[in-house]
Amino acid sequence: MQYSPNLAHGTLLRRYKRFLADVLLDDGTEITLHCPNTGSMKNCLFPGETVWFSTSNNPKRKYAHTWEQSSTPDKQLIGINTGRANALAEEAINLGVIKELTGYDRLQREVKYGEENSRIDILLSSDTRASCYIEVKSCTLLEEGSTSGRGYFPDSVTVRGQKHLRELIHMVKQGHRAVLLFVVQHSGINSVSPARHIDVAYSELFTQALDAGVEVLAYQTQMSPQESQILTSCPVIT
């Protein structure tokens, strides 16, 4: 995924009201960014560090700038925009990067499914095999003080994420293939685990999903102000 134009940068001052962040530009101008991340952003907020943002030409938007990436004190790069995870996953599937998800004829986004009024992030289908329902999650929480690069999901209690696991379990029971795909958007994360210390219910449903036959994959993203792309798989530690 290429950014056109390249992402601009500034210095993070503060995040507030959940969806807003103030940034100081090199020329001394202070601007407000839209923060497209509903999580706690635990271990992702570092005032005084560099952030990168995109700019929209849509005149109807209240905030033209969107927070895309952030730097940590040890110069790791984090993808803040959780909405990018779905687009990155779609691109990687179409390019054949995610080997476990090749061999399908059609890819659809945001298709209604399940029993709880849900929409699947990605649906793969073919005339010769069972459909594959894929829920995409962005993983950015690096374990504090970790030397092994262990990442966790979620970074806050997620009732919505719990619902998605129940839906995936249901699809397996209906004879379909179901996949939970973690898109790792933190350059310091080398493995992914369910965050039992944050959301016990999610962790328990995660185990139930594995037992039911839901597949869990994790892939790392290479990021820069010019482009982001999924490159390699990493372990899921349960």
UniProtKB/Swiss-Prot annotation:
Transmembrane segments: none annotated. The gene is sfsA. Belongs to the SfsA family. GO terms for molecular function: DNA binding. The lineage of its organism: Bacteria, Pseudomonadati, Pseudomonadota, Gammaproteobacteria, Alteromonadales. This is Sugar fermentation stimulation protein homolog.
